[in-house]
Amino acid sequence: MRVAVIGLGLIGGSAALALAEAGHDVLGFDPDPATRDAAAAHFPVTGDPAGLAGTELAVVAAPFRHLAAVAAETLDGYTGLVTDVSSVKAEPARLFARHRFVGGHPMAGKETAGFAAAEPDLFRGRKWVLCLEADTDLGDWTALAALWTSIGAHVVPATAAAHDRAAARISHLEHLVAAALVRVADEPLARTLAAGSFRDGTRVAASPTALFAGMVEGNRDELMAAADDLAAELGTARRHLDAYTDWPSSISEWFDEARARRADWPPEPLAAQRIPLTREALAELGAVGGWLEVVESEVALARRPRVKSTS
């Protein structure tokens, strides 16, 4: 497939490298000359939007704040299939409504950015959401699912709304919490004593601020709802601490419940099974948190997470 990758940072660069290694005809596009020079050692590059016309697929990996310009200017008149890698999905669907668009989001990344941080195996074994709406062209969706599974990703069907709600809770909120933890611990002695717990809990606070700004701009309502849920949980913990003298087991029970839920992650996959590539089968798979590992002509090899009994 002839694929244009627009934006050659960590995610776009990694996708371009992986696709090139898989034998696809990759064209990189980036407005930054230094980035183009670095990428040119691996695949052809251009800074001219006119050069994208001969490609079959455009993978938009530009920062969120630039998506509107990419849709209206860089891809003006583009007739190929378009997908993106943004961490929010409802807003890109609106911006690219005039294109043949299927939203996507690879659940992979690092706290470092730029083409220098890109690696072709970044997505291997990682989940890659592909948005499946009632009006999504199933042929386009399947073509993208086949493409991303071919570089080792596990494709999860989901609606944009379902994705954005989940992403707010397992990704965007974590950036907010990491920044808050850094701010709470900003004392000389605390910083000297900080070790594993602080490092693990604050790792993503080292990410570029622009990354989080895109999450806020594109998913603010869901992020506020998730922040409210977190505040409620912290309020519960605070009440348990206040009641510790009279009810010392309450905070332990709160921790035990969280520990049990954490022990169930990541979910254990069931045996792989073939499913038809129909809208109904894919939607049902995504609704239970399942994913595709191999896409064939009319069927796909899929897995579902094991649901543990609560009895």
Q: Regions from the language model: what does each represent?
A:
Residues 234, 241-243, 247-311:
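NAD(P)-dependent dehydrogenase/reductase Rossmann-like domain
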Residues 122-206:
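Internal alpha-helical scaffold of NAD(P)-dependent oxidoreductase catalytic cores
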Residues 49-76, 81:
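Rossmann-like NAD(P)-binding element
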Residues 2, 25, 100, 127, ...:
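Residues at the starts of beta-strands that form the adenosine-phosphate
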Residues 61-63, 85-86, 132:
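Glycine-rich, N-terminal phosphate-binding loop of Rossmann-like dinucleotide-binding domains
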Residues 1-53, 57:
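NAD(P)+-binding Rossmann beta1-loop-alpha1 motif at the extreme N-terminus of oxidoreductases
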Residues 194-266:
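Interdomain hinge/lid region at the active-site interface
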Residues 69-116:
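Rossmann-like NAD(P)(H) cofactor-binding subdomain of soluble oxidoreductases
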